[in-house]
């Protein structure tokens, strides 16, 4: 009986674990958008309705980032975890990273 319970628990983890982890990896897009509107707008166009922050924006818009063919959640995580000379030394918590990544990925357009 005990081995049956252990096996059932392991199977549940295998079946439901990846789905829960995948949902957690992307965070909350609404929270990510709110954070990005406060922290990222000096250089990036964060929202599709936002006016460019500079006359000649140097940083790509979040829409352009989301729709670049090479953009993936893991790539965004690596980028946000690594300092870059053109970006301020913005340190995001793991939850903030997931939320911002969730927002960026929510901007990705469906391909036909």
Where are these regions (language model features)?
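Electrostatic cytochrome c docking/interface patches
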Residues: 18-35, 50
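Twin-arginine (Tat) signal peptide motif
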Residues: 1-4, 29
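Extracytoplasmic electron-transfer domains, predominantly the class I c-type cytochrome c fold
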Residues: 56-106
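Bacterial N-terminal signal peptides
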Residues: 4-15
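Detector for the c-type heme attachment site
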Residues: 43-49, 67, 81
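The canonical Cys-X-X-Cys-His
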Residues: 32, 36-47, 100
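Short beta-strand/turn micro-motifs at beta-sheet edges
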Residues: 48-51, 74-76
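Short, solvent-exposed mixed-charge patches
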Residues: 110-112
């Amino acid at each position: 009986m005990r081995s049956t319970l252990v096996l059932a628990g392991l199977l549940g983890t295998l079946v439901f674990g990846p789905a829960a982890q995948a949902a957690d990896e992307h965070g909350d897009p609404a929270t990510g958008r709110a954070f990005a509107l406060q922290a990222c707008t000096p250089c990036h166009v964060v929202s599709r309705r936002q006016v460019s922050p500079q006359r000649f924006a140097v940083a790509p818009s979040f829409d352009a980032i989301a729709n670049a063919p090479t953009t993936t959640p893991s790539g965004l995580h690596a980028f946000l975890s690594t300092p870059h000379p053109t970006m301020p030394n913005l340190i995001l918590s793991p939850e903030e990273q997931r939320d911002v990544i969730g927002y960026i990925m929510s901007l990705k357009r469906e391909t036909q």
